[in-house]
């Protein structure tokens, strides 16, 4: 759902990252506004629920343990992927060291992860197209509805899609293509089934 734009008739039809950040700096958008910039549109993020929160915690812990100091794991922080998009993925593994991002946002990632319950359609369509167009080599959707992880690889930026899509299930491991030798168990990413 698009966030209502400021009532200024001169507001652009498509917001740039710089214009969006100015709205944040000027207090037009605040911390209580759960929005992100996708393709120049200010979009309301799906509200978090307990399964989503549990998934984010599990993904965070699993990635930090697996990646160690070979890259940086960022959680629900913005990623600048072009002049019109500043998504806030649930997790991103970015190259470099923590200090590399003290004064600037990352513009790429080795892996982006969305934990998906109520946002599955947007994560499969809008976010997939956005991350593929940015050339992000690997995109996982931790699909809470179907209790699996959708692994997308081999981005085709011009087509805004991934050539490879695999479903990973409990009992399997997923190796990160950007960090050879690093893998994560699917069971560590998915919340435990309800009792």
Positions of PLM-derived features:
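Gly/Pro/Ser/Thr-rich low-complexity, intrinsically disordered segments predominantly at protein N-termini
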Residues: 1-195
């Amino acid at each position: 759902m698009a966030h209502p734009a400021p009532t200024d008739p001169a507001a652009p039809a498509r917001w740039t990252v710089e214009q969006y950040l100015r709205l944040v700096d000027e207090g037009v958008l605040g911390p209580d506004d759960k929005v992100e910039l996708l393709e120049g549109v200010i979009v309301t993020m799906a509200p978090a629920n307990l399964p989503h929160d549990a998934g984010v915690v599990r993904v965070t812990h699993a990635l930090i343990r697996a990646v160690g100091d070979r890259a940086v794991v960022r959680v629900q922080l913005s990623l600048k992927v072009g002049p019109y998009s500043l998504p806030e993925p649930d997790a991103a593994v970015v190259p470099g060291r923590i200090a590399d991002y003290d004064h600037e946002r990352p513009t790429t990632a080795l892996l982006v992860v969305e934990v998906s319950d109520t946002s599955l359609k947007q994560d499969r369509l809008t976010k997939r197209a956005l991350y593929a167009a940015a050339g992000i080599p690997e995109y996982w959707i931790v699909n809470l509805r179907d209790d699996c992880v959708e692994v997308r690889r081999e981005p085709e930026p011009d087509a805004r899609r991934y050539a490879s899509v695999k479903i990973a299930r409990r009992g399997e491991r997923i190796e990160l293509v950007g960090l050879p030798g690093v893998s994560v168990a699917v069971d560590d990413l998915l919340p435990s089934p309800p009792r």
